[in-house]
A protein has these predicted regions:
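Cys-dependent protein tyrosine phosphatase-like superfamily
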Residues: 1-35, 47-138
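Ser/Thr-glycine-rich phosphate-binding loops at phosphate-binding pockets of nucleotides
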Residues: 40, 44-45
Length: 138
């Protein structure tokens, strides 16, 4: 049940938060420093960072490697939940490749490519992408 819930959320994140991604990328393009966080730091924040890395041209396998680092660096204290089975707790508190893959699959199913998604849904044209890359990579 938790897995299904998370998979559905990840499929929706790129479309629910497209405006937030646009704002984040605009701020980064302007040279602003930002902090991206949420309760667990892997779902909404992880997807946002994955979209930024993708917009920067980072290879997909590297985007996934970065996302999965959450499992190494996130404080595992306090994960015990009375009344919840350990697998459910693990599903909720783990960054899993299948979750982020659900987001990218939803983008590709609806838009064809991530590039089309960034242009048509997030609103980033080639000029905006170039500004982001200049601000973050130069």
């Amino acid at each position: 049940m938790a897995r299904t819930y998370l998979m559905e959320n990840y499929q929706n994140y790129p479309f629910l938060y497209a405006k937030a991604y646009a704002t984040l990328i605009q701020r980064l393009s302007a040279g602003d420093r930002v902090i991206v966080h949420c309760t667990a730091g892997k779902d909404r924040a992880g997807t946002a960072v994955a979209m930024v890395l993708t917009a920067l041209g980072v290879p997909r396998d590297t985007v996934f490697e970065d996302y999965l680092l959450t499992n190494q660096y996130w404080d595992r204290g306090g994960r015990e939940r009375p009344g919840m089975d350990p697998e459910t707790v693990a599903q909720i508190f783990s960054a899993r490749e299948e979750y982020l893959n659900a987001a990218f699959s939803a983008i590709e199913d609806r838009c064809g490519t991530v590039e089309t998604y960034l242009k048509d849904v997030v609103g980033l044209d080639q000029t905006a992408l170039a500004a982001l890359r200049t601000a973050c990579l130069d």
